[in-house]
Regions:
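Surface-exposed recognition segments
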Residues: 73-87, 161-162, 184-187, 204-276
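Cleaved targeting-peptide boundary
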Residues: 20-25
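Short aromatic-cysteine micro-motif
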Residues: 53, 77-161, 182-202, 275
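Positively charged n-region of N-terminal signal peptides that target proteins for export
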Residues: 1-4
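Hydrophobic h-region of N-terminal signal peptides that target proteins for export
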Residues: 10-17
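GGW-centered surface loops in extracellular recognition modules
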Residues: 28-61, 66-67
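Short, solvent-exposed loop/turn elements at domain surfaces
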Residues: 66-77, 101-103, 114, 245-249
Length: 276
């Protein structure tokens, strides 16, 4: 049985943040973890969601960038964001929005989210749940959707080769681009309501933590090309901060992690493709 747990990002963990109550999901009695959709997904409705997804994939031109606690992060940077290092990436595609509940339901036939709404980002999904979703999505589309690597995520959050060097994804004023502690109204918000970043990507800071493909790992100062993280591990990386975090933890270089079967109402995903 998959579990819904309370998870915290603890300072004692190699890449953890200071423990905070906002990193915890609600009690299991409040969370619907596998709710079947009573209506079968009509073919036209499902296809409309799949077509929308493909039209929302943003081309991210490859390039070289400095990953980690760069100068604009200042004293807010945590040790696990260091050292900075040069990373070169090939081009890829990233969805301009976090996966919505409408898309998840069209593919999976259920909606596990704590907060409900078709255009809200799906949450209360684990890394393992996301792999099942992606497998079914690829079967439906004939594509090879995946989670972004941690390096791809940060490069895109920084604006790729259009970067303006912001502290958050798309702006130095967090409220312009993110739902976070100061403006969350105690819930997630529909995708795409805030301003986008330089690449036209929305909600890369705040709203939900976004899962990456990498196992947890530490940085080195060595230059890397298309890094994928450690080959094995016990915890997966997630990036971007969420609706419950303060500004410090929504910066574009912040790193966090969770177990592959952890779920929470602050955890979701964004899809990547190597080729469209």
């Amino acid at each position: 049985m998959k579990r819904t747990i309370l998870f915290s990002l603890l300072l004692a963990l190699p890449l953890g943040l200071a423990a905070k109550s906002e990193f915890c999901c609600p009690s299991a009695s409040k969370v619907e973890t596998d709710v079947p959709w009573q209506e079968k997904t009509p073919t036209l409705r499902r296809q409309a969601e799949l077509d929308k997804l493909l039209s929302n994939m943003v081309y991210v031109s490859g390039g070289t960038f400095t990953m980690g606690a760069t100068s604009e992060q200042g004293s807010d940077a945590y040790d696990h964001e260091k050292p900075t290092h040069s990373v070169t990436l090939r081009s890829f595609y990233l969805c301009k929005y976090e996966v919505t509940q409408a898309l998840w339901r069209a593919v999976m036939g259920n909606n596990p989210s704590y907060f409900k709404g078709d255009n809200l980002p799906v949450e209360n999904v684990s890394w393992n749940d996301c792999q099942t979703f992606i497998t079914r999505l690829n079967s439906l589309t004939g594509k090879k959707f995946r989670l972004p690597t941690e390096a791809e995520w940060e490069y895109a959050a920084r604006g790729g080769n259009r970067t303006r060097g912001y502290k958050y994804s798309g702006n130095n004023g967090l409220s312009n681009v993110a739902w976070y502690e100061e403006n969350n109204s105690s819930k997630t918000h529909p995708v795409g309501l805030k301003s986008s970043n330089e690449l036209g990507l929305y909600d890369m800071s705040g709203n939900l933590w976004e899962l990456c493909s990498d196992w947890i790992g530490t940085y080195s100062s060595s230059a890397q090309t298309n890094p994928i993280g450690p080959l094995s591990g016990s915890r997966r990386m997630m990036r971007g901060g969420c609706w419950l975090n303060d500004a410090r933890d929504c910066r574009l270089s912040v790193r966090a992690h969770c177990a592959p079967d952890d779920r929470g109402y602050n955890l979701g995903l964004r899809l990547a493709l190597s080729h469209l």
